[in-house]
Amino acid sequence: MIKDDIYYMKKALARAKAAAKQGEVPIGAIIVDKDGNIVSTGRNMSELQKNALHHAEIIAIDRACKKLGAWRLSDCTLYVTMEPCPMCAGAIVNSRIKRVVYGCFDKKAGAYGSVFNLHEYPLNHKYEIEGGVMERECAAILSDFFAELRKRPKGNKNEN
C-alpha cells in the first residue's frame, strides 16, 4: 500500500456518504491519474436514476473517459469503498485501469476473491489489486446504512 491510498480512500468514502444521504447504497469511487490528480468521482446512483448499471465504479469510469477523451485509462488508479461486483470488474478490465484499491470485501457479489476471482481468468488485461484499505471504515458505513434501512417500514426503503 502506498501512503496516498488512505488519502484517496477517504475521498471515496466522502462520495459513499453522499450516496447514503440520498438513500443509495453507500459506495463511492474515485479515479486518480499517474500524477495523483483526481480525474473523476462516482457514487452509487441506481435508485435515484432507476438504472441497475449506475454503480459508483461505472459512473467514475464513464466520467474519466469523457474527461480524458479516451476509453483506455491505463495510467489510472481506481479507489472504491467496496470490492467491485462482476459488472464493475468487467468494466475495469475493458477500461484498462492500471490499479484497483478497494476498502471492504463483498461476500455476496465480490469479483476479486470474495465470491470468485475474475482476475484469475486469462483476460486481455491484467492490473494490480489491493483490498482491505480502510476496511473497517468502509464496512461500517454499509453496516450503518443497512441497519437504518431495516428499521424503516417496508414501503419506505428508499426514503431518507
Where are these regions (language model features)?
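Zinc-dependent deaminase
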Residues: 1-22, 84-160
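Conserved hydrophobic/aromatic pocket- or pore-lining residues that grip, position, or stack substrates
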Residues: 12, 28, 60
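Short, basic and Ser/Thr-rich N-terminal targeting/leader segments
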Residues: 23-27, 74
